[in-house]
């Protein structure tokens, strides 16, 4: 665990790089990571942005709007995590790894104040002994973690994959 002064110093560093962050969000994020590290000393972390599609208004096709409210409900992020876990469990079953428990750690925040369009920032935590890389995320047809993440988001939104796969964005420094 971080001491209060260490958490304050971390917040200064984070805010210098990314902008303002809630001290409560930072504290919770550090706790999630610490708890995951206590279970798995070797951790693979993935940073990803999950976006909503934009649908033009019928009267003005050039004016973007957000996706229908029924999809923007809080359950969409829950469906995302459930779909990703389901895909991983199915893969583990196919590979005969059903006896070994699997844990997915995650941190998420919905950005809607500083952005024109609401979207999620997500960090996924994996036991590095099980999963240690995204794979080629430029290939939508690959059998890798990047594809599973994209499929999970499309399923959460109830949209077709790979048609909406680009709604998932992996920043250049996505893997840790």
Task: Report residues per predicted region.
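Short N-terminal edge-element motif at the start of the domain
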Residues: 54-103
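Catalytic "initiation/cleavage/transfer" segments centered on a nucleophilic residue
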Residues: 2-40, 128-176
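Intrinsically disordered, low-complexity regulatory regions enriched in Ser/Pro/Gly/Thr
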Residues: 39-42, 100, 114-117
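Short glycine-rich, low-complexity/disordered patches
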Residues: 47, 88-106, 159-176
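Short, solvent-exposed secondary-structure capping/transition elements
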Residues: 57, 93, 118, 129-136
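Catalytic micro-motifs at enzyme active sites that drive phosphoryl/nucleotidyl and oxygen chemistry
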Residues: 33-37, 96-97, 105-114
């Amino acid at each position: 665990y971080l001491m209060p002064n260490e958490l304050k110093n971390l917040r200064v560093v984070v805010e210098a790089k990314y902008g303002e962050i809630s001290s409560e969000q930072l504290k919770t994020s550090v706790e999630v990571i610490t708890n995951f590290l206590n279970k798995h000393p070797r951790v693979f972390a993935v940073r990803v942005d999950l976006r909503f599609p934009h649908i033009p208004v019928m009267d003005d096709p050039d004016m973007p709007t957000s996706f229908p409210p029924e999809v923007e409900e809080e359950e969409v992020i829950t469906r995302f995590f459930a779909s990703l876990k389901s895909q991983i469990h199915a893969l583990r079953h196919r590979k005969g790894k059903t006896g070994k428990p699997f844990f997915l750690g995650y941190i998420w925040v919905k950005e809607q104040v500083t952005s024109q369009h609401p979207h999620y920032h997500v960090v996924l935590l994996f036991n590095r002994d099980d999963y240690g890389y995204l794979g080629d995320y430029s290939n939508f047809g690959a059998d890798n973690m990047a594809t599973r993440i994209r499929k999970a988001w499309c399923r959460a939104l109830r949209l077709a994959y790979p048609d909406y796969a680009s709604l998932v964005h992996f920043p250049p420094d996505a893997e840790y």
